[in-house]
């Protein structure tokens, strides 16, 4: 990773992966849900800081994620639009860290616990570097020459012991300040698109605006504590 500190902005589109047409069949084209879209401002310092502000189209804060060394806060702020941590994390940044522990954590955050490394040849004879357990469905594929992340694969188990295939695809790679990054990240359930994140702005920074972000995290942490005390008051 060539960047030490960066600010990234993304626009996230959300789709209904199981929308049906008039005949009751799954729609061939994904149906976008504009009211569910959101945007993000991401501040990142390799190995130390990851702060994600997730906002609606009007700029109202929906979720705030604050990670600064050992400090961690992840809070959903809109009762009508609950977002979990896995909904908002920009996975490619941690995957490209220069620090082994961060790269390992990125794998674990996407369900890849067993980290065996091997070459994988696809049906169309493309060669990838595979990390994880290919047979179990929990693995990541990388370009063996550039180490660019190509895709992450996982399985979401259902109550009836069946599963849905989760696939995250990283594509349209561009280069900024000697570092490649995926301009577009797409999320699929059983090969049906349900989310697309597009990087709209990116720049490296000499310093993060950490003081203001720390103050915001402090206020939100105390708000969360006060809300819990109120909700569970006897």
Labelled PLM ranges:
Residues 1-79, 133:
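N-terminal mature ectodomain segment of secretory-pathway/periplasmic proteins
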Residues 4, 68-146, 155-162, 219, ...:
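Flexible, processing/modification-adjacent segments and terminal tails
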Residues 11-17, 25-26, 58-59, 79, ...:
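Non-transmembrane domains of secretory- and envelope-associated proteins
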Residues 42-44, 63-70, 89, 99, ...:
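Aromatic-rich beta-strand edge motifs centered on tyrosine
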Residues 46-50, 124-126, 134-137, 144-151, ...:
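Coil-to-beta-strand transition motifs
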Residues 48-49, 72-75, 94-98, 150, ...:
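Short, surface-exposed linear segments at secondary-structure transitions and domain or protein termini
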Residues 52-54, 75, 152-153, 168, ...:
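Beta-strand-dense domains in secreted/periplasmic systems and polymorphic toxin scaffolds
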């Amino acid at each position: 990773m060539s960047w030490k500190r960066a600010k990234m902005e993304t626009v996230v589109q959300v789709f209904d992966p199981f929308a049906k047409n008039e005949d009751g069949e799954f729609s061939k084209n994904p149906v976008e849900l504009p009211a569910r879209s959101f945007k993000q401002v991401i501040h990142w310092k390799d190995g130390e800081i990851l702060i994600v502000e997730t906002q609606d189209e009007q700029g109202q804060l929906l979720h705030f994620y604050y990670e600064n060394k050992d400090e961690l806060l992840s809070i959903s702020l809109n009762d009508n639009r609950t977002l979990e941590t896995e909904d908002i994390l920009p996975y490619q940044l941690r995957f490209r860290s220069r620090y082994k522990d961060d790269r390992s954590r990125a794998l674990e955050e996407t369900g890849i616990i067993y980290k065996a490394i091997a070459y994988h040849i696809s049906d169309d004879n493309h060669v990838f570097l595979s990390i994880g357990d290919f047979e179990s469905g929990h693995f990541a594929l990388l370009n063996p020459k550039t180490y660019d992340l190509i895709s992450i694969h996982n399985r979401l188990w259902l109550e009836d012991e069946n599963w849905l295939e989760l696939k995250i695809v990283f594509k349209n790679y561009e280069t900024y300040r000697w570092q490649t990054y995926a301009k577009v990240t797409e999320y699929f359930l059983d090969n049906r698109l349900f989310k697309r994140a597009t990087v709209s702005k990116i720049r490296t920074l000499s310093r993060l605006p950490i003081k203001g972000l720390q103050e915001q995290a402090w206020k939100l942490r105390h708000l969360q504590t006060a809300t819990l005390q109120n909700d569970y008051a006897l």
